[in-house]
Amino acid sequence: MYFRQIFEPKLAQYAYIIGCQKTGEAVVIDPMRDIQQYYDIAEKEKLKITAAADTHIHADYISGLREFAERGVKVYASDEGDADWKYEWLIGSDYDYELMKDGFTFMVGNIEIKAIHTPGHTPEHLIFAVTDKGGGADKPMGVATGDFIFVGDVGRPDLLESAAKMKDVMKPSAQTLYKSIEKFKSMPEYMQIWPGHGAGSACGKALGAVPKSTVGYELQFNNSLKHATSEDEFVNFILEGQPEPPLYFAQMKRDNKMGPKVLGGLPIPGKTETAKLGDFQGNREVALIDTRGREAFMNGHLKGAIFSPLDKQFNTTAGSYITEEQPIYLVIDEQDLEDAVRDLVNVGLDKIKGYIPVAEYEKWLADNNAAVAIPHLDFEKAGDKLLSGDVYVLDVRKASEFSEGHIDGARNIPHTRLLDRIDEVDPEGKTVYVHCSAGGRSAVAAALVQRFGHDVAYVDGEFDNWFNKEEEVAG
């Protein structure tokens, strides 16, 4: 049996290629949208991808299942859950597909894949137990757990309500998840766990960075599973302190259910003339993404630009600050373009119209005296203002962080929800001072606040260190 885990660091997502080396066939489990990467691996290993399967309708990225279906690969999707949780683009189509209920099995060469229904994260969620029958095994080696069991955590049951805006489903989903965990506890302790996400994903609150585990280890040391001693205890624990989901999650659920647009490959855009920048100035109908570093952006950028640097949060920021209808232009150098495009289409942002190289962008700003800046202060310099009431304090940390300590009078809007709640920012003529815990989230949020016409200052540095000192002085 061939096994390969493929990690996408910006979304902390794991996909899997599992192949039968005797027959040369392979399946891809939970593929992302850019499926060429899986073909490249399969070709190198002398395997042919004959199947692809999703554990569930994903909320955090566009699935590659339809891309595989377009290429004639047989795809497997859940048929659990009610009518709201069906793959509408697939059912009744001309694609080669099978719909799976609990206990459904299919073969990839001599490898058996068995679907097990584990609702809770979503109603239709399946996990896949993998048995290497060609190697003589009659019991599963491991299980691809999707967003059900992670290393150190379990899949959050609140997303249907907090992201997809369904009403009164959070607690029932948590209760259902508890029942699925009871089923999980009966699995052999030796079985390997191959999760759908790792540390950095918003699909849980305490995911580990170790890529694999075992059933036995997780039953002993997974904190969420340790709280599954009773339904009430588990429900209370799992619903407390979940991070606010990025704004694009609701769109991903819809697109993966109804059918994402078929790409057929990455849509690499051409270069845009700098003369177009004049049309983009202050134009919120267009999304100009400035991917430069923080200092360069704060010192000077086009009015209305969205700040989304090329770091691990690029997908999250872009997906939370840009709508799918907006045409996108990138301030970026050509060598970084392909990766940025891949990141954007992974979260359903397909309307990428062009790019402007950094040097040409900066020259145009200087030649046209068009650069605007955002004042940049640390907590020591901004402290008196933050405490004075003379400025509007916007705290873009998570609600759980805010509850542990915050500036009196501060407005808390987590940065991934800021676009949806931007009308709540009402400074009444005051400058908006934006802060988070260490400066990363507040930097991108300050740019968004400025994009909507407010005077803004960006506060950098370690909030907790400064805040604790202020409390000591006050005490």
Walk through the language-model features, giving the residues of each.
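Core dinuclear metal-dependent hydrolase active-site scaffold
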Residues: 3-5, 16-17, 105-138, 142-143, ...
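Active-site HxH/HxHxD metal-binding segment of metal-dependent hydrolases
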Residues: 12, 23-26, 33-117, 131-134, ...
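Active-site flanking residues adjacent to catalytic metal/cofactor-binding acidic residues
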Residues: 29, 55, 146, 152, ...
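Active-site metal-binding loops of divalent metal-dependent hydrolases
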Residues: 31-32, 57, 80-81, 121-122, ...
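Histidine-centered catalytic micro-motifs
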Residues: 52-62, 117-125, 193-201, 434-438
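Rhodanese-like catalytic fold shared by cysteine-dependent sulfurtransferases
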Residues: 88-90, 156-158, 167-170, 217-251, ...
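Metallo-beta-lactamase
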Residues: 112, 122-244
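Short, well-ordered beta-to-alpha junction loops that form the rim of enzyme active sites
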Residues: 195-200, 205-206, 250-252, 291-293, ...
